[in-house]
Amino acid sequence: MAEQVALSRTQVCGILREELYQGDAFHQSDTHIFIIMGASGDLAKKKIYPTIEPASFQRLNTHMNSLHHGAQANRLFYLALPPIVYEAVTKNIKETCMSQDVMQNHLLQMLCLVAMEKPASTNSDDVRDEKDELQEAWRIFTPLLHHIEREKTQPIPYVYGSRGPPEADELMKRVGFQYEGTYKWVNPHKL
């Protein structure tokens, strides 16, 4: 039996990235946009940047520029910023980047997450400010999470391999969205 060698996290991420880019499955999936604010963050420097090639940045920039409003994209905002600017940044994210109608926006499945870097200082005022910001974030998201839990919305069944349920197309037509794609799902297990 061959000896197994432990891989570093960077090597694992590199292998996963290569596998994702192979074949058509990656290119038919949902769009994910990562917005990193504050390039000096520890996670960004140690884990994110080493796994992304310079050419990937150019492709990502070209792709993001080609998106029509990016409304269907899942968005993750990674804040590697000093705590003093969290309030202003999260308010702007809430006002301009989150769906204003999240409850009824299940069709678009727009996801907006905010991740924060560990505190830059242990000063009691800074820690208190971050606690206040997190409480504000939970004040915004808790009612939404409770609503989702109360509704216990069941997924609409649809044919395996299809674009989704016909009700989704009907809703898109009612709100004025015209699907112009040529999506055709290919079962990766039968290739």
Curated annotation (Swiss-Prot):
- Tell me what reaction this enzyme catalyses: D-glucose 6-phosphate + NADP(+) = 6-phospho-D-glucono-1,5-lactone + NADPH + H(+)
Q: Which residues carry this modification: Phosphotyrosine?
A: Y179
- The source's superkingdom equals Eukaryota
Q: How does it sit in the membrane?
A: Peripheral membrane protein
Q: Name one GO cellular component term.
A: cytosol
Tell me the GO molecular function terms.
glucose-6-phosphate dehydrogenase activity; NADP binding
Keywords per UniProt: Acetylation, Carbohydrate metabolism, Cytoplasm, Glucose metabolism, Membrane, NADP, Oxidoreductase, Phosphoprotein
* Positions of NADP(+) 1 binding: G38, A39, S40, G41, D42, L43, A44, K45, Y86
Q: Which residues carry this modification: Phosphoserine?
A: S8
Which amino acid positions bind NADP(+) 2, per UniProt? Answer: R163, Y179, W185
The keyword Cell cycle is annotated on this UniProt entry: no
Q: What is its EC number?
A: 1.1.1.49
The record's InterPro entries line, in alphabetical order, gives:
G6P_DH (IPR001282), G6P_DH_C (IPR022675), G6P_DH_NAD-bd (IPR022674), NAD(P)-bd_dom_sf (IPR036291)
Q: In which pathway does it act?
A: Carbohydrate degradation; pentose phosphate pathway; D-ribulose 5-phosphate from D-glucose 6-phosphate (oxidative stage): step 1/3
Residue sites binding D-glucose 6-phosphate per the record? D101
Query: Where are residues bearing N-acetylalanine located in the sequence?
Result: A2
Has keyword Iron-sulfur? no
Q: Which GO terms describe its biological process?
A: glucose 6-phosphate metabolic process; glucose metabolic process; NADP metabolic process; pentose-phosphate shunt, oxidative branch
Q: Which residues carry this modification: Phosphothreonine?
A: T10
Q: How is it modified after translation?
A: Acetylated by ELP3; acetylation inhibits its homodimerization and enzyme activity. Deacetylated by SIRT2; deacetylation stimulates its enzyme activity.
- PTM N6-acetyllysine: list the residues: K173
Tell me which family the UniProt entry assigns to this protein: Belongs to the glucose-6-phosphate dehydrogenase family.
Identify this protein by name: Glucose-6-phosphate 1-dehydrogenase
- Species of provenance: Didelphis virginiana (North American opossum)
> What is the taxonomic lineage of the source species?
Eukaryota, Metazoa, Chordata, Craniata, Vertebrata
Instruction: State the encoding gene.
Output: G6PD
